[in-house]
């Protein structure tokens, strides 16, 4: 009985953690989703963004006390502008999806919403982590050895 309880707890912790992509696994996935040079943004830029926003974790969330919004998923897409979490005051939901959809292991909806974000005039500069860690940097290491 004790062994079953421990096994159950281990399985629960894995389910809650979500998918953490390996670097090259994510690079290949993003390439398949057409992210390389989408709106002129290189695959290496997307990889750098995902690394600094979520460390490649689909379940990452971060609460922003200032505007009471939350950033969701592998790209840390914000609930004030892009998705609906049912609790962010004045949410716009420009991607027309529930924020929980951005936390799925299948990143199809997260990619579609990220494409929507960069279609706005601010582009990839909408992400603070990209401006702080990726802009004007050599990003080759993010895709090196991945065959993409």
From Swiss-Prot:
The active site is at residues 53, 71. Residues 1-18 form the signal peptide. Gene3D superfamilies: 1.10.530.10. Its EC number is 3.2.1.17. The lineage of its organism: Eukaryota, Metazoa, Chordata, Craniata, Vertebrata. This is Lysozyme C, non-stomach isozyme. GO terms for biological process: defense response to Gram-negative bacterium; defense response to Gram-positive bacterium; killing of cells of another organism. Expressed in blood cells. Disulfide bonds join 24-146, 48-134, 83-99, 95-113. Lysozymes have primarily a bacteriolytic function; those in tissues and body fluids are associated with the monocyte-macrophage system and enhance the activity of immunoagents. PANTHER family: LYSOZYME C (PTHR11407:SF28). The gene is LYS. Keywords: Antimicrobial, Bacteriolytic enzyme, Disulfide bond, Glycosidase, Hydrolase, Signal. It catalyses: Hydrolysis of (1->4)-beta-linkages between N-acetylmuramic acid and N-acetyl-D-glucosamine residues in a peptidoglycan and between N-acetyl-D-glucosamine residues in chitodextrins.
């Amino acid at each position: 009985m004790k062994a079953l309880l421990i096994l159950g707890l281990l399985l629960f912790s894995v389910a809650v953690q979500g998918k953490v992509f390996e670097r090259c696994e994510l690079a290949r996935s993003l390439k398949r989703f057409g992210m390389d040079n989408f709106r002129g943004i290189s695959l290496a830029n997307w990889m750098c963004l995902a690394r600094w926003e979520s460390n490649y974790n689909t379940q990452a969330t971060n609460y922003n006390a200032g505007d009471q919004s939350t950033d969701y998923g592998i790209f840390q897409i914000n609930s004030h502008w892009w998705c609906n979490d049912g609790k962010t005051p004045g949410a716009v939901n420009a991607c027309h999806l529930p924020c929980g959809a951005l936390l799925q292991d299948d990143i199809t909806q997260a990619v579609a919403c990220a494409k929507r974000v960069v279609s706005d005039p601010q582009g990839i500069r909408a992400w603070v982590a990209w401006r702080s860690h990726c802009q004007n940097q050599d990003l080759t290491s993010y895709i090196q050895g991945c065959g993409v």
